[in-house]
Amino acid sequence: MATPSAIPTNSKRDTTAQFHRVTRGNRSLWYQLTVLQQPERARACGSGMKANSDRRPVDPPPVVELRIVEGPTLEEGKDVTFDYNANFFLYASLEHARPIASCRVSTPTTNNPPILTGVPASGMAYLDRPSEAGYFIFPDLSVRHEGLYRLTFSLFETTKEEQDFDIQPADGDLPPGVDFRMEIKTDPFSVFSAKKFPGLMESTQLSKTVADQGCRVRIRRDVRMRKRDTKSGGNNNNNNNAGNNAGNNGFERREEDFGRRRTVTPAAEDPHGIRNRSQSNSSEHRASYSDVSRRPSMVDSYPPPPPPPPSYDPTPSAPRHLAFGESSGPKYPAPRQYAHQPGLQITPVPANGPYPSAAQSPYAKTDAPYGYSRHLPPSCPSPAPSVNRDLYDRRQSTSTYVPPSPSVYSTEGHYRRDSQASYPPTPAAAPLPRMNTEPSRGSIKISALVEPMPVIEPQVDPLPELPPVNVGGKRKHESVFAQNTRPLFNGQRQMDPHYGRSHRGYSPDHDQGSYSRADGQISVIQFNKYEY
């Protein structure tokens, strides 16, 4: 007869339970269950929609050992764990470690039992290490609510041979051949919330040994313990919010790395260099600036003129005249009218002569007499429409005086209107208001200036109007299918103008039908004559 007896031990970690029974074949069998690996902590997974996706198992996974001994006593008997022909499985259930006193008012805590999720049943695996025995492993057990719990393991046996059956069945509710043998409980363990969970520990040596023999156990090589805040003056709230602090520290580290990678654009040392920037390559050959205290003259406000008239002197200083691409474009539009004084004689200078220096320039101390403010900076860019207005003004003033315009193309065929390298050397000239227009220029002619004008704005006679081209025979939908725009009431329908007597003036006979073709013509079709 089966006589169960639970003998707890005082071991620190292992919990042992024993059971003895006598079979029909008069065999004395001893069962011994030992919890080799106790659960220590777990994280509550909750009962929401994300409970199954974000679930942590009990750490470390519980491992229970089973030994079967045949003999008069457990110490004198023979170990028949591998020779005994039967199947065993262990079922795990969860219970509170501290008994809850019953109260008069029912609360959700007392009504809802602790919920264990995962795989609560395990079959026995025969392993050689750490010792030859049968082992039950629970690698996938989770608890839904936080608290202090313990696991209860129930051992069931499925007997295969009749001589190993019990003399008297212990439980009539179980199917024949399945018997409940014994149960064992683990030590209490804590289930933390997701905020307070300290993290998973490194896998134990027992878990690694079991996994090496083919059992499905998750192995963690590193410690995944949450780092606590160890700052001075911290309280319990800081320890509880360790996850938030770790996130903030990581954010601060990312900010520091980002600030270390950022580069600050250095400030310009020369303030004049910022104002003189343009799309030209003048920065590569920039000459030294002249004295800041010098008053801006009218020469600085205009780009260099074309070669024919020795009018402007674009060289306020010798180094700037020789620099390529110094001027970035027309500064101001050309004046509309220029008042000239015929009393001044201009001596022509040969083209290959030396260039006058800055001290010999007659514009060094001359004010701008044409109403332009001398307070404007010489490098102020002008708007783009000034070129067209200059071309229009030049047509009106060609009879008296033709001012050089920056929009006229140079005779060398260059399209850079803002570069001095496109023009030949320009001779020195007198101030503008005292220019004489008498034709004593040698080989210089005004026609050389007017000649490129038709290229800039060609005046072409309008082309004769071409006859209309017949694209196809299709007509617009409105000309063929004209619709009436007035509203329709009481079942009225649109009137077809092709069948109206007033539009076509054609009335077919009763045995004929007319229809409109695609080209707009009316065709007649003869109906078949049937006798009724």
Curated annotation (Swiss-Prot):
Location of motif Nuclear localization signal in this chain is 40-45
Q: What happens when the gene is disrupted?
A: Impairs aurofusarin and trichothecene biosynthesis. Reduces deoxynivalenol (DON) biosynthesis. Results in highly reduced sporulation. Reduces the hydrophobicity of the cell surface. Shows increased resistance to osmotic stress and cell wall-damaging agents, but increased sensitivity to iprodione and fludioxonil fungicides.
Q: Where is the composition biased (Polar residues)?
A: 481-493
Ranges of biased composition (kind: Basic and acidic residues): 251-260, 283-294
Q: Which PROSITE patterns match?
A: VELVET
Return the domain comment text from this UniProt entry: The C-terminal PEST domain is a region rich in proline, glutamic acid, serine and threonine residues that is required for the light-dependent regulation of development and secondary metabolism.
> What family does the Swiss-Prot or TrEMBL record give for this protein?
Belongs to the velvet family. VeA subfamily.
On subunit structure and binding partners, the annotation says: Component of the heterotrimeric velvet complex composed of laeA, ve1 and velB; Ve1 acting as a bridging protein between laeA and velB. Interacts directly with laeA and velB.
- Protein name stated in the entry: Developmental and secondary metabolism regulator ve1
What organism does the record attribute this protein to?
Gibberella zeae (strain ATCC MYA-4620 / CBS 123657 / FGSC 9075 / NRRL 31084 / PH-1)
Q: By which gene is this protein encoded?
A: ve1
